[in-house]
Design a protein with these regions (language model features):
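Intrinsically disordered, low-complexity, compositionally biased regions/tails
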Residues: 8, 24, 143, 149-150
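Donor-binding and catalytic core of enzymes assembling or modifying cell-surface/extracellular glycoconjugates
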Residues: 1-83
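Nucleotide-sugar donor-binding patch of glycosyltransferase catalytic domains
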Residues: 33, 40-41, 72-149
Length: 151
């Protein structure tokens, strides 16, 4: 939400909210918390329709998901928010990308298996993703060492 607000307020960006039908309520909630006139809920019947819309994005901010890999395959510039997975194993491939991660000593702790994701931390559960800050993502996009193709 905070990243969306900052992109809209400071860069006049349009924010597209992707996800499956099970995430429609979440996408609507996010859209309402940022500026609805600058955010768009992507609801498609077919995965290929979502991909066609993704191709129009200037940059794709995502977690480690199928859409991250699709964005990479499309040659999009990708900002990947990585928490419990291994960024050396799952990173966007053959495209310009930045990895935003806390690089905690307990990560990676998720190794693609049928077991559900659990967190062994006692201080903050899933700290690796919950404590990623907007400025970390913003700086990877716009500041020194960020992408020269986004202004």
């Amino acid at each position: 939400v905070e990243l969306g607000k900052k992109l809209i307020n400071e860069k006049n960006a349009k924010v597209l909210l992707f996800g499956g039908p099970e995430e429609d309520e979440l996408k609507l909630s996010i859209s309402q918390m940022i500026k609805p006139e600058h955010s768009f809920l992507i609801k498609t019947e077919k995965f290929l329709q979502s991909i066609a819309i993704m191709k129009r994005c200037n940059v794709f901010v995502t977690n480690d998901s199928a859409l991250m890999h699709v964005a990479s395959a499309l040659g999009l510039k990708v900002i990947a928010l990585i928490g419990p997975t291994n960024p050396h194993y799952i990173h966007p491939w053959k495209t310009e990308h930045k990895i935003v991660s806390l690089n905690l000593d307990c990560a990676p702790c998720f190794f693609y298996s049928p077991k559900p994701l659990t967190c062994s931390r006692t201080d903050v559960q899933f700290k690796c993703i919950k404590e990623l800050e907007v400025d970390m993502v913003w700086n990877n996009i716009f500041q020194k060492g960020g992408f020269p193709w986004i202004g």
